[in-house]
């Protein structure tokens, strides 16, 4: 009985409807493939961004060291003009 029901449904579907259903399935398949491609691209981008962030974090300690150096130099220049600051040769003789 089930087979006769599907045969009856097939007879009720016109050729135009069959063509529409086939084309709809093709378009849905293309959309699915495109979405998968986009998802793969986004995953690759995510991996690249995570790698870049990891490299940046590796330089954080170096950045902190340079910041400390520049902050120290800035505090020295605020205390005395450059002409009055001792040079290495002057500090060795003291």
Curated annotation (Swiss-Prot):
Subcellular location field: Nucleus; Cytoplasm, Cytoskeleton, Spindle; Chromosome, Centromere, Kinetochore
Subunit structure: Component of the DASH complex consisting of ASK1, DAD1, DAD2, DAD3, DAD4, DAM1, DUO1, HSK3, SPC19 and SPC34, with a stoichiometry of one copy of each subunit per complex. Multiple DASH complexes oligomerize to form a ring that encircles spindle microtubules and organizes the rod-like NDC80 complexes of the outer kinetochore. DASH complex oligomerization strengthens microtubule attachments. On cytoplasmic microtubules, DASH complexes appear to form patches instead of rings.
Record carries keyword Nucleus: yes
Additional observations: Present with 799 molecules/cell in log phase SD medium.
Known role: Component of the DASH complex that connects microtubules with kinetochores and couples microtubule depolymerisation to chromosome movement; it is involved in retrieving kinetochores to the spindle poles before their re-orientation on the spindle in early mitosis and allows microtubule depolymerization to pull chromosomes apart and resist detachment during anaphase.
Keywords: Cell cycle, Cell division, Centromere, Chromosome, Chromosome partition, Cytoplasm, Cytoskeleton, Kinetochore, Microtubule, Mitosis, Nucleus, Phosphoprotein
Organism domain of life: Eukaryota
Post-translational modification Phosphoserine, affected residues: 91
Family from the record: Belongs to the DASH complex DAD1 family.
Record-given protein name: DASH complex subunit DAD1
Annotated InterPro entries: DASH_Dad1
UniProt GO cellular component terms: cytoplasm; DASH complex; mitotic spindle; mitotic spindle pole body; spindle microtubule
Single Gene Ontology BP annotation: protein transport along microtubule to mitotic spindle pole body
